[in-house]
Each structure stands twice: as structure tokens, then as C-alpha cells.
Amino acid sequence: MMKRNNLIDTLRGFAIVNMVIYHLLFDLVYMENFKIEWFEKTPGMIWERFICISFILISGYCFNLSRNHKKHTITLFIVAMILSVVTYFFANEFFIVFGIIHLLCLASFITIFVDKLTLNKKILCVLSFVMFILTYKISAHPMDISTNLFSFVGFYNDKFYSGDYFPLLPWYFMYLVGYCAGDFLDIKLNVRENVLSKMGKKSLMIYLIHQPIIMIIVQIVKFLGGI
């Protein structure tokens, strides 16, 4: 269970809406050859980074609100495995080896131990942000190594591919920024429950089912001659 904060859930819901729209456009552009020039250029990349960073920061922050970290981590692990198995057998060209849910699962697991340490969270927050910047491009290109066993860290060769890829470097540092912020940034401002906050509370379920639904809708519209 997690202590709910409608403002946090609203922000998460906003990120979810952005993610669904982004993936809809992604499917249209890269699977149906729909031409959206801005989406394929810098604005699309910035939008994608904004969505990912939002999710990771909020997840790190919410670590402090969770009452059962082990249960949450196990839930993320199950969802991550479902995503890997489903994409391997039914969408192999988009097989997810280590995507954002895998990252959040491992980040939650590691942070269970980090949370037991006596650390100055403000200093750790600054150091984590600096390390995020310094390691940002580590996983941007393949390395001259013989194995992909450490692809979850960010080290892989040119034979590696993952349809969604968020390794520990640099992304765990962004998770730590959110985690540390949750210790000294006590968000007391709250809002009334709304559509976005309701979506935020169901974000994991929406993440799990939104892509198949989008693909089905796109194919139906395509069949009817709308694309």
C-alpha cells in the first residue's frame, strides 16, 4: 500500500496521458509510416525524455510513500517479466530486454538497501543529479565488449537490442534524485481527486494495457480506410 497524494497522482496521470499520446504517434510514424516531421526530430525527442524523466522522478519520490517496498518491487518484477515475455513472442522486433519497468523494479530493489543507510539526502540529491549528467551518454552507443550480460547497467555490444531501454546508468541517478527529494521536499499542497489523479492511481495497469489497445485501434482505423 502507498499513502496517496492527489497532487502526485495528478502529475503521474499527466505523465500517463502524455505517454499514451506519444506511443500512439510512435506507432503511426514507425509502424504505419505516417509522416509527422516534428515527432521524428528534436521536439519529439524532448517530449519523450520529459515523459520518461517525469515517471522516474515521481517513482523515486513515491518510494518514500510506500508502506511495503518488497511487495511493490515484486509487483514491478512481475509486470516487467510479462512485458518481456509478451514482446518476445508476439512482437519480437520490439522485444523489451530492460525497459523502464525493469529499471523501476531494480531501482526500487536497490533503494531498499540505500534507504537503510544514514545519508545526507540533500547532498546525495545533488551528487545524483551530477552523476546523471556525467553518465547520460554512457549507454547511448554500443561498446567493444563480448557480452551483453551487463546491458542492464548500460554496457552492451552492437548485437544488443531492446524495444524499450532504460539501463541503470544514467537513469538510476534520476530515480535517486526523486527519492532524495521525497525526504526533504514534503509536498503538502494537495488537490481534489480528478480524472488525472484517478489515472495516476492506475498508472501501472494503464502502462501494461495501453499499447495493445492502441495497436488494435490503429489497425481498426486502418482497416476502415482512415489511415
Label the predicted regions:
Residues M1-I227:
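Alpha-helical transmembrane segments and their immediate juxtamembrane cytosolic regions
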